[in-house]
UniProtKB/Swiss-Prot annotation:
Gene Ontology CC terms, in alphabetical order: cytoplasm
Originating gene: dltC
Name of the protein in question: D-alanyl carrier protein
Family (UniProt): Belongs to the DltC family.
Keywords on record: Cell wall biogenesis/degradation, Cytoplasm, Phosphopantetheine, Phosphoprotein
Top-level taxon of the source organism: Bacteria
GO molecular function: D-alanyl carrier activity
Source organism of this protein record: Bacillus mycoides (strain KBAB4)
Amino acid sequence: MAEFKEQVLDILEEVCENDIVKENLDVQLFEEGILDSFAVVSLLVEFQERLEIEVSISDFDRDEWATPNMVIKKLEEIR
């Protein structure tokens, strides 16, 4: 589980180009401007390619994916 969490955080950090996602797992990704709609598409592609977890853009709800902790939780539910 810890390895999965680290993989998710690594992907988030790369796509967001901001290491705060590893330092503060409750940072508001959208409210703080760390993640935008373009980055969401890149993020979902990375999750599919690197973690083999497919998330449809239509299933993506900003409120459920608002923080790094929430992203990890949602991906754990899906996989």
